[in-house]
Amino acid sequence: MDEGVIAVSAMDAFEKLEKVGEGTYGKVYRAREKATGKIVALKKTRLHEDEEGVPSTTLREISILRMLARDPHVVRLMDVKQGLSKEGKTVLYLVFEYMDTDVKKFIRSFRSTGKNIPTQTIKSLMYQLCKGMAFCHGHGILHRDLKPHNLLMDPKTMRLKIADLGLARAFTLPMKKYTHEILTLWYRAPEVLLGATHYSTAVDMWSVGCIFAELVTNQAIFQGDSELQQLLHIFKLFGTPNEEMWPGVSTLKNWHEYPQWKPSTLSSAVPNLDEAGVDLLSKMLQYEPAKRISAKMAMEHPYFDDLPEKSSL
């Protein structure tokens, strides 16, 4: 058992208030810590009978979160507790700090009123996202499932934190082959859609670009309902890729002959974004993964030059 797992029944320590979500590996509850009255998020992970001890996915998540907990833009894992379900099965509770809302709900609140998110708010959220991802990537961690729903935020302070690192995996060079049970389609990088088995931090940067565009327009930029449809949405905006635009693309496993589209201008998809913003977005949404801007370089981009409180974010 991981040394940090405390064998105290979680239900003695916490009062469940409501179910707030269903993660990849288990349910998430808003709960109150009885001793302090503090509100926390409890992520409940079931341990299957056929597994010896704690699932490797959970142990991986715990070790990653412990390592990343130092960063202000990664949701903090406060504790890990063991408990028993009604059926007497062992369950593990990951205790996280609780955040009131997430970027998906935040965008929806603007969309429902027909208003745009203020430019400086978008800048601040994007800077924090790039900063958090630069920290993860700097520690050899890919998120692989970035989307507005797992970017938690405090609406009072506009502090953003990256959550749900359940699918995160430490990457070391050379890149390992990965399974692709990852990512919600809308934020999925084209190399993943095309069946690449070697990928890098660039998959997260594509997702960051999609989130950026969505903050600007209140709508997801590519809304495919299948892997093929998702690719076609991307091709319609950026043109159907070829070997000249993206060397090696035609060797990817899922590559076929696709309809030929000519590129449109990116600014037409994000009409309210200024020139510097469009430039940064275009660097995030490059076809060729090696050409995509890194999170660290994105933080240095002129788009963020007029953000006053960078050092305090």
Curated annotation (Swiss-Prot):
The modification Phosphotyrosine is found at residue 25. It catalyses: L-seryl-[protein] + ATP = O-phospho-L-seryl-[protein] + ADP + H(+); L-threonyl-[protein] + ATP = O-phospho-L-threonyl-[protein] + ADP + H(+); [DNA-directed RNA polymerase] + ATP = phospho-[DNA-directed RNA polymerase] + ADP + H(+). GO terms for biological process: G2/M transition of mitotic cell cycle; hormone-mediated signaling pathway; regulation of G2/M transition of mitotic cell cycle; regulation of meristem structural organization. It is an enzyme of class 2 (transferase). Keywords: Acetylation, ATP-binding, Kinase, Nucleotide-binding, Phosphoprotein, Serine/threonine-protein kinase, Transferase. ATP binds at residues 20-28, 43. SUPFAM superfamilies: Protein kinase-like (PK-like). The active site is at 145 (proton acceptor). The modification N-acetylmethionine is found at residue 1. Pfam families: Pkinase. GO terms for cellular component: cyclin-dependent protein kinase holoenzyme complex. It comes from the Eukaryota. The keyword Coiled coil does not apply. Belongs to the protein kinase superfamily. CMGC Ser/Thr protein kinase family. CDC2/CDKX subfamily. This is Cyclin-dependent kinase B2-1. It comes from Arabidopsis thaliana.
